[in-house]
Amino acid sequence: EPVPIKDTSCKRILIDSCVIIEMLQDPEFQNNLFKLFDGTTKPVVVDKCLFEVQKVTGWKVSTVKDVLSRIFGHKVHIIRTTKPIEQMEYSMRFKYPGESHSADSTLLALGVRLDWQVCTKDGGLIRLCKKENVKTIHPKSNGFIFQGELK
């Protein structure tokens, strides 16, 4: 496995950078999203998404990680992009040229490989996830839109 996680009894949801940015900016959005992660569901963040958040917000990666941990009440699992993950990402970018950037391809590849949901507001990523049968969660200010059932 490219991403070993000790506790497999919990559902894992990959969080896209656009969702993280909105969480950092909107406390009401934070509260709505927090309801999704109820103790049996754990947030997972890819390092590439953290770098995107840093680029957009100007916040240090360590600060973003600390804030996310504070929001969720526990340390958020961060996936480092290793060679095997880069290879999976590359295969998705090759399969869908011009349709997604690096972090989106990584989320898509991990969603396919590990059978995890992706939480995103990015319509392009949602379309690609649908093509690959990866379940998505689109957070809205008043709830969630699920593509597929939450596992």
Region locations from a protein language model:
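A generic structural signal for short hydrophobic patches within well-formed alpha-helices
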Residues: 20, 50-53, 125-126
